[in-house]
Amino acid sequence: MVGGLDIFRERFSQFSDNFVIIGGTACDEILSGTGMRPRATMDIDIVVIVENMTSEFARAFWAFIAEGGYRLGVRKDKDEAPKYVLYSFDHGKVGFPVKVELLSRHNEIFTSAAHTEPLPIDGEVSSLSTIILDEPYYNLTVQNSFVSASLRYAAPLALMALKARAYLNLIADREAGKKINTKDILKHRNDVLKLTATLTGTDRAIVDAEIADTIRAFAEGLLQSLPNQSLQDALRSSEAAIRMFLEALPTYYTARQ
């Protein structure tokens, strides 16, 4: 379990309709009940459900940041107008999550309760935070979420789409000559495949065409890379099993007509 999640749950158990947890913490929640090993993570990434925003949640969040002794994280800024509001806090004190990142579309209720400025993120950052600001991905994540022990998490179908897009973005950036950490690429790749293994025959999502295209491109690219020993080692699976997962992956998403 992610360090500090218990105290986070204590403070926010009544606000499960106000936000969705994404990223590694959501993956950990889903995979912890399976035979697959969750990836270690130290942070909690939160997406605010703007339609359900309340002043009570805003006050509770800022009280938590103060109680945890967090400091404002540093992010790159190109002096461009922010497209959304991002708050990144790290170095939480003992017992709290090491890092908390909150993303929201601009919302006066939330920002007016803050005592610090939001962090604009430029277009070069390939992360779940930037991807989820696209309307189709935001809607998919909110609609495909579940509550477990009083906290709301993104469900596998949403996480897989976010991580497949992040993976493809990072690959494109690397091919364009940008310096990319290979670990970030492998992290998203492996998480998508692990999450695919948790799906059942009834799991389906109606999505915008761009999400269906993303899933198809992700699956086709990895199929072309087989046999892939790195993938087999990471998933502790055979080539045949990985091929089966990749071939099935696009069938879970149907493009909206």
Provide a role label for each language-model segment.
Residues 1-257:
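Compositionally biased terminal segments of proteins
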